[in-house]
């Protein structure tokens, strides 16, 4: 039974291989389209390889630290040098998923554009297949690596190292990718749209290739690494708590639910079909719904592996209660996605209010957008609170972990739908730059519009899953560190709470400033090219795309280091400093989880709302493109870009990474 998980991971990778071959056999279009696609592909892969080369030093340092700490706590059962093997495996699997997804996404984009010359259904098929490769790579490598590590070592504490490896890569991928894409996006929008008055994806814009590369490094590789981390983190939290609470077969159930989720996602992918002129959103929703229903049925069967009645700690629970806790997580994920859609879609009042406020200038646009983001935290918090209380009543701490597993059981489908968006967006950019028939751009714009909605829902889902996963990992940490309660009368704990509450703000400041510095360089370069290259604005000369790509790449690699180290070093420092220790660290994790979740929701939703308010005006409202309201909305969207694509999403990984660092090094903290 234990081998079923890694075998299912292999099935996912085989399905990804089948989809890759299908995409590669598709027509990549005319020479001009292929030339543009090659530039995007080479820029994306160059960034990814440079990022991975930079991370080698971090991985080697962390590996050495784990080995040293393992020998220092050799007498402690849970801290062993072998944890370093699991850590390296986690980093390699995360890197592998990102590499596979990026390779295929940057090939699917041009083929989607070419397919749109024939039919919208063909374009949807290619774009979703490209997204599905990323989805299957995430769940396939995640479950294969995790399943093998669990089977070989049969020690949940060693398995924790796999989650640490996944988290380490995820944070750098999210931050680095977010800085890259937003530096390019801000430069392309402010100088191209506002100052030069040229449309989006216009080939005269020097930052246009960097902008399209950024869609891939941020929204494909970065997003995939984020959900890869949540996926393995939720499973590992379930395994760790089951082992700590001595639940019979409890370590097996999370792996089985994940395996069932992979099969459900594969079957659901075959239902993403639509007729000509039909709604692509409906097709994606159908595939997601089929996968979710199959996962629910499979989860019920998987929980039958548990005894009908069992004891965890001093409490008695049932297998039916575990099933109910898992479903509570799944429902919470769906609800948070829908709440996110309400606050970020142009179909609803919040975005329309921001568009309306744009009529009186940038200031009122910013004020309305910020207030919308803050207001959007209320319902997700209530949903998470209800899910936590319900899952705890159903199955205790193990129930909270299983709620996170349930929410992430169909990660294969979630990533596929999310990664579909940037592929469709790139296809539209290629169609514009290659000067294809306007009908092609109309089809790709329709697919991209759906992609914007799915991306917003995906961000909400990622944030919700991060909160539950972080809480489950926090529960595993308290069990490993033998902390029975967080005592709010203890000054050390209160100090930890305040430090933890501050960290997401510091992290957001560092990442926002990084985007600002990188965008400044990009804006200066784009302005320079418009002024110094004769005939560029008339379309008679070609801009220096490579220079803008180099600026984004260099800035992203340089600026991702400090925020990444912050998430690892702060919990280690608090846990090791005399007078603070494991209790203060518990307070820090609690404080960071609360404020980090709130910041993530606020920033992601405010940014998404600003973006769609701009698109709402571009659709013809309040004067349409070129109007004063549109200029204000573009400025608001530019502020929102690092909110929704850099700082907000990276906040998810911050709270999970700090918790998993604490969990892995808990034996070391206990011996001080």
From Swiss-Prot:
Q: Which reaction does it catalyse?
A: Na(+)(in) + diphosphate + H2O = Na(+)(out) + 2 phosphate + H(+)
Q: Name one GO biological process term.
A: sodium ion transport
**How is activity regulated here?**
Requires K(+) for maximal activity.
Cite the EC number: 7.2.3.1
Which cofactors, if any, are listed as required?
Mg(2+)
Q: Where does Mg(2+) 2 bind?
A: 212, 215, 425
Site positions for Determinant of potassium dependence: 455
Class in the EC hierarchy, top level: translocase
Single GO MF descriptor: diphosphate hydrolysis-driven proton transmembrane transporter activity
Where is this protein chiefly located?
membrane
Q: Which GO terms describe its cellular component?
A: plasma membrane
Report the subcellular localization. Answer: Cell membrane
Listed binding positions for Mg(2+) 1 are 185, 189
Q: Which domain of life is it from?
A: Bacteria
Q: What membrane topology does the UniProt entry give?
A: Multi-pass membrane protein
Listed binding positions for Ca(2+) are 611, 637, 641
Q: Where does substrate bind?
A: 182, 644
Q: Which UniProt keywords apply?
A: Calcium, Cell membrane, Ion transport, Magnesium, Membrane, Metal-binding, Potassium, Sodium, Sodium transport, Translocase, Transmembrane, Transmembrane helix, Transport
Q: Which residues cross the membrane?
A: 1-21, 55-75, 82-102, 133-153, 158-178, 227-247, 252-272, 283-303, 317-337, 370-390, 397-417, 461-481, 492-512, 560-580, 584-604, 650-670
Residues with site note (Important for ion transport): 174, 219, 226, 645, 656
Subunit comment for this entry? Homodimer.
Family, as annotated: Belongs to the H(+)-translocating pyrophosphatase (TC 3.A.10) family. K(+)-stimulated subfamily.
Q: What does this protein do?
A: Sodium pump that utilizes the energy of pyrophosphate hydrolysis as the driving force for Na(+) movement across the membrane.
Recorded protein name is Putative K(+)-stimulated pyrophosphate-energized sodium pump 1
State the organism named in the record. Moorella thermoacetica (strain ATCC 39073 / JCM 9320)
What are the top taxonomic ranks of the organism?
Bacteria, Bacillati, Bacillota, Clostridia, Moorellales
Q: Which gene encodes it?
A: hppA1
